[in-house]
């Protein structure tokens, strides 16, 4: 089951974001007092901007590998759904802990206790929880198609069968990091 963000007015979204930032600031202060500071850092390339609170020592490799994966996925997405013009830089927010992801979702207007990531078109963010790297990458393969489709077609009102069908299709590709390519695997499973 996949969760989608509800529409929130810009003014309400701004208030929610400010509340979240105060909450994160309080969490960071508490974490800092306990020796576990939550610091966000960003890495960009031509296609994506990653913002994360992962420990930089381990997180830099995860983010670099994720950027490579998403670059390979983008080629596949473009083959099946060619973009209509220039694409915006995709924003990806990676959370170290699911509890922080849930707090962020709650602060931005959605209580979400089940998902470990999603594409939020209202905030133009792909959100991912990285507690389990394998689950994070599977979620990223799926949700990044929603993000791509939104930017590639300059709209967000796609038929659910098309949007979810393609996202599920790309969720199951096999990635070859040495060649930075994806391979479609048809297991015969159908929705």
Label for each model-derived stretch:
Residues 37-159, 174:
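Juxtacatalytic substrate-recognition/specificity segment
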Residues 1-11, 102-103, 184-191:
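Short, charge-rich amphipathic segments
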Residues 1-39:
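N-terminal low-structure segments adjacent to metalloprotease catalytic domains
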Residues 6, 14, 22, 92, ...:
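Residue-level marker of intrinsically disordered, low-complexity segments enriched
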Residues 20-31, 101-105, 148, 187-191:
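Generic hydrophobic, helix-prone segments enriched in Leu/Val/Ile
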Residues 156-191:
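Post-HExxH zinc-binding segment in Zn-dependent metallohydrolases
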């Amino acid at each position: 089951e996949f969760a989608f963000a509800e529409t929130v007015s810009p003014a309400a979204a701004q208030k929610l974001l400010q509340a979240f930032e105060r909450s994160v600031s309080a969490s960071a202060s508490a974490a800092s007092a306990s020796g576990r500071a939550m610091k966000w850092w960003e890495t960009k390339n031509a296609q994506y901007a990653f913002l994360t609170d992962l420990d930089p020592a381990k997180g830099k490799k995860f983010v670099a590998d994720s950027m490579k994966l998403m670059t390979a996925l983008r080629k596949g997405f473009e083959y099946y759904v060619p973009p209509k013009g220039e694409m915006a830089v995709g924003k990806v927010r990676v959370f170290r802990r699911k509890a922080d992801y849930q707090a962020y979702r709650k602060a931005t207007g959605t209580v979400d206790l089940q998902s470990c990531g999603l594409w939020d078109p209202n905030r133009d963010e792909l959100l991912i929880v990285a507690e389990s790297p394998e689950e994070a990458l599977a979620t990223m393969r799926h949700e990044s198609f929603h993000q791509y489709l939104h930017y590639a077609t300059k709209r967000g009102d796609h038929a659910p069968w098309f949007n979810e069908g393609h996202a599920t299709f790309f969720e199951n590709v096999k990635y070859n990091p040495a060649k930075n390519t994806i391979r479609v695997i048809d297991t015969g499973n159908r929705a």
